[in-house]
Amino acid sequence: MNDKKPTIQDIFLYVRDNDLVNLSRLTKKQRKVFNDICRCRKQEMGCNTEKCTCGYKRIHYNSCRNPSCPMCQRFKREEWVDKNNHYTLNITYYHVVFTLPEELNPYILLDKRFGYRCLFDTVSDALKTLAKDPKYIGGTIGITAVLHTWSSTMGFHPHLHCIVSGGGYNQSGEWISKDKFLFPVLVLSKLFRGKFLDTFKKEYPLRRLNNITEFNNVVSECCEKDWVVYTKEP
């Protein structure tokens, strides 16, 4: 029995070889990602050969270098983490996750560039707004944000992971520490919800919509929902 966990490539190859995917239903970009991952480090990508003077040969198949491929982006990810570690301070940091309601997913998919920009901008705005309040910090914080678009079950699930400094600099340049508690989750959740939906409704490219009334109804429904914001020390 093979206990090895399947990789994304294993899954893609399985559905391709068993005719379980209709590539014609994918966008051009999605088809490229799918095909690149299937070929990554396979013979069709070409190879480099190491040869020892003793006659031993070792073949290395080339990577696809697609930004969405988890295999050949691993080094870049580790390089990014190492680079950002040089900018960390000897302070407390908090891990904050912002998740969008699934009702908005169809509209995010219609215009991902706008949807993701809206998510980044309003998350940053919400965090900075609370940080400037003397009741919480009264200063300017640091934020590193990373977008995730998949859930653990491989479904479309856009959410933002943020590493937030446990404190900030006030107008006098003094450091205000926040070691035990960042912001009330409920307050942050409501503020984020309001900022996101306000921007989303006002600036969404309406030319992409077939039914504006339905869009407005979905936005109104999301106003009444509790939005998921999660925070803890990383």
Predicted regions and their residues:
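Beta->alpha loop/short-helix hinge microenvironment recognizer with preference
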Residues: 1-234
